């Protein structure tokens, strides 16, 4: 039986889920990794004060994964619930994350993990929202394309619940650029709901909505390698967005991530991979798309030229730090920045307007996006968000 699994950010197809991580040998390999490489002592953990009856809960799931086997969705759900309820030690968490990466995370495992994150998060109760987000890790150092696109999409009448964080691997995360634009990024779920109702746009700062992540953060920082959490973030939008544009730098993640979104009940989504390794719809290469629509997966490829846009170069969309990228975003919305930077925003916005049903095609979406910028409506959305979030 063929089994598909995700290794951090890579997908492995193999004939069986068995691996070298079996029995005592597997446990020894992982413990040596934790002690010698990650610097996490397995004998001294933050949860040492917990009674043994609580600290042993995760062990049966650790054994399954360390034996090279995969968790069922229900087992993955229970394991993540233990972790995000502060009932596991740092070493146990590190062991599980490392073993999962070495084995390769399955669609069922990611689905189970994501369901727990969505249950534990502070929720924003507004229906019909869209999120446009990337997994990161494409190493392109591009400006904040999806954040800039959010203003264009909202100007066209689609509610955007932009979920994001500060920079981790790049110079500027969504939170960094919005803060530099004058947006107050910290918000309660009530404030976010008000913003979505009043102006059709809100930034959902991940740290404000995922308090249970504090039980995982220190371990992730100490491990210092990609884990399943790198792809869980986009799957846990506090508004449970009905529509999504989700970019990845790895084409092998397209179909698995699409299937996870289907498991989570997404209405329509577009998983995108720029063939130049961009986790956005690319202006400098064809883009491979896996569209989720009506419970079906449709895979196809698009090019900038298909929509009357001139192909650019990756160097044309390189960004800066938060302040520099804020200037790029404002320049595009004001109409002073043209060329590839504007065009890639039009392309990504156009795809979003198509996937949420505001436009009947990507081509129509691109034209609508251009109208939103040229009319000043997209810039007005930025000004409205700044004013609303800073209101006393």
Residue spans of the language-model regions?
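Acidic, glycine/proline-rich low-complexity segments that act as flexible tails and inter-domain linkers
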Residues: 51-142, 154-156, 160, 311-319, ...
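Acyltransferase
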Residues: 17-51
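Glycine-rich anion-binding loops and their surrounding alpha/beta cores
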Residues: 119-122, 142, 157, 179-186, ...
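A glycine-rich phosphate/pyrophosphate-binding beta-strand-loop-alpha-helix module
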Residues: 97, 143-199
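Short, small-residue-biased leader/transition segments that mark boundaries at the very start
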Residues: 1-13
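Acidic, glycine-rich active-site loops and adjacent beta-strand->loop/helix elements
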Residues: 134-139, 164-170, 209, 275-276
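Catalytic-loop motifs flanking and including active-site residues across diverse enzymes
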Residues: 25, 29, 145-149, 173-174, ...
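Active-site glycine-centered loops adjacent to acidic/histidine catalytic or metal-binding residues
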Residues: 16, 137, 233
């Amino acid at each position: 039986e063929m089994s598909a699994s995700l290794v951090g950010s890579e997908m492995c197809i193999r004939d069986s889920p068995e691996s070298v991580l079996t029995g005592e040998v597997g446990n020894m390999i992982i413990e040596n990794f934790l002690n010698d490489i990650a610097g996490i002592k397995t004998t001294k953990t933050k949860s040492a004060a917990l009674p043994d009856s609580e600290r042993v809960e995760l062990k049966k799931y650790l054994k399954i994964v360390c034996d090279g086997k995969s968790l069922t969705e229900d087992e993955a759900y229970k394991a993540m619930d233990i972790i995000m309820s502060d009932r596991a030690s740092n070493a146990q968490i590190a062991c599980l994350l490392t073993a999962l990466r070495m084995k390769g995370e399955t669609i069922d495992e990611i689905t189970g993990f994501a369901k727990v994150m969505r249950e534990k998060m502070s929720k924003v109760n507004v229906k019909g929202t869209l999120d446009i987000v990337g997994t990161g890790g494409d190493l392109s150092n591009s400006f904040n394309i999806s954040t800039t696109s959010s203003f264009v999409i909202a100007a066209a009448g689609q509610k955007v619940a932009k979920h994001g964080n500060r920079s981790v691997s790049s110079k500027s995360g969504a939170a960094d650029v919005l803060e530099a634009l004058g947006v107050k990024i910290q918000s309660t779920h009530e404030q976010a709901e008000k913003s979505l109702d009043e102006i059709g746009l809100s930034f959902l700062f991940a740290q404000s909505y995922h308090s249970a992540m504090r039980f995982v953060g220190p371990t992730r920082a100490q491990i210092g390698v990609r884990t399943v959490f790198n792809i869980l973030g986009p799957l846990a939008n506090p508004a449970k967005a009905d529509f999504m544009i989700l970019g990845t730098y790895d084409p092998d993640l397209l179909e698995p991530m699409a299937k996870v979104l289907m498991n989570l009940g997404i209405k329509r989504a577009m998983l995108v991979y720029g063939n130049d390794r961009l986790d956005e719809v690319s202006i400098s290469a064809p883009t491979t798309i896996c569209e989720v629509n009506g419970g079906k997966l449709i895979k196809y490829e698009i090019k900038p030229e298909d929509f009357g846009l001139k192909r650019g170069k990756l160097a044309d969309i390189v960004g800066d730090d938060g302040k520099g990228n804020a200037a790029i975003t404002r320049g595009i919305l004001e109409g002073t920045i043209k060329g590839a930077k504007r065009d890639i925003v039009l392309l990504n916005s156009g795809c979003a307007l198509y996937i949420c049903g505001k436009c009947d095609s990507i081509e129509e979406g691109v034209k609508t996006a251009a109208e939103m910028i040229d009319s000043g409506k997209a810039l007005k959305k930025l000004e409205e968000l700044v004013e609303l979030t800073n209101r006393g």
